[in-house]
C-alpha cells in the first residue's frame, strides 16, 4: 500500500493500553486504537495521555491506526 492511500488525522491520546497501544480520539470525534510507528519507537519518543498526535490509517480499517507524529 502506498503512502498516498493512507488517511491522516489529528487527535488526542485518551488512554494508554497494554502492549504499547493507545486509544486516540480524533478531531472528528471517532475513537481509534493506535500503535507507535517504528521511528517513534526507535528514537524513544514517549507518547503520554493528553498528547496531541498525528495518526495514519488505512481506508480499509478505520478502527486501527499508527501514530506518526507527536506534538
Curated annotation (Swiss-Prot):
<comment type="function">
    <text>One of the essential components for the initiation of protein synthesis. Stabilizes the binding of IF-2 and IF-3 on the 30S subunit to which N-formylmethionyl-tRNA(fMet) subsequently binds. Helps modulate mRNA selection, yielding the 30S pre-initiation complex (PIC). Upon addition of the 50S ribosomal subunit IF-1, IF-2 and IF-3 are released leaving the mature 70S translation initiation complex.</text>
</comment>
<keyword id="KW-0648">Protein biosynthesis</keyword>
<protein>
    <recommendedName>
        <fullName>Translation initiation factor IF-1</fullName>
    </recommendedName>
</protein>
<comment type="subunit">
    <text>Component of the 30S ribosomal translation pre-initiation complex which assembles on the 30S ribosome in the order IF-2 and IF-3, IF-1 and N-formylmethionyl-tRNA(fMet); mRNA recruitment can occur at any time during PIC assembly.</text>
</comment>
<dbReference type="InterPro" id="IPR004368">
    <property type="entry name" value="TIF_IF1"/>
</dbReference>
<feature type="domain" description="S1-like">
    <location>
        <begin position="1"/>
        <end position="71"/>
    </location>
</feature>
<dbReference type="GO" id="GO:0005829">
    <property type="term" value="C:cytosol"/>
</dbReference>
<dbReference type="GO" id="GO:0003743">
    <property type="term" value="F:translation initiation factor activity"/>
</dbReference>
<keyword id="KW-0699">rRNA-binding</keyword>
<comment type="similarity">
    <text>Belongs to the IF-1 family.</text>
</comment>
<keyword id="KW-0963">Cytoplasm</keyword>
<dbReference type="InterPro" id="IPR006196">
    <property type="entry name" value="RNA-binding_domain_S1_IF1"/>
</dbReference>
<keyword id="KW-0694">RNA-binding</keyword>
<dbReference type="GO" id="GO:0019843">
    <property type="term" value="F:rRNA binding"/>
</dbReference>
<dbReference type="GO" id="GO:0043022">
    <property type="term" value="F:ribosome binding"/>
</dbReference>
<dbReference type="InterPro" id="IPR012340">
    <property type="entry name" value="NA-bd_OB-fold"/>
</dbReference>
<keyword id="KW-0396">Initiation factor</keyword>
<dbReference type="Pfam" id="PF01176">
    <property type="entry name" value="eIF-1a"/>
</dbReference>
Amino acid at each position: 500500500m502506498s503512502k498516498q492511500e493512507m488517511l491522516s488525522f489529528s487527535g488526542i491520546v485518551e488512554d494508554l493500553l497494554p502492549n504499547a497501544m493507545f486509544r486516540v480520539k480524533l478531531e472528528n470525534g471517532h475513537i481509534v486504537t493506535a500503535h507507535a510507528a517504528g521511528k517513534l519507537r526507535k528514537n524513544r519518543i514517549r507518547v503520554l495521555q493528553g498528547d496531541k498526535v498525528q495518526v495514519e490509517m488505512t481506508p480499509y480499517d478505520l478502527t486501527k491506526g499508527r501514530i506518526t507524529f507527536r506534538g
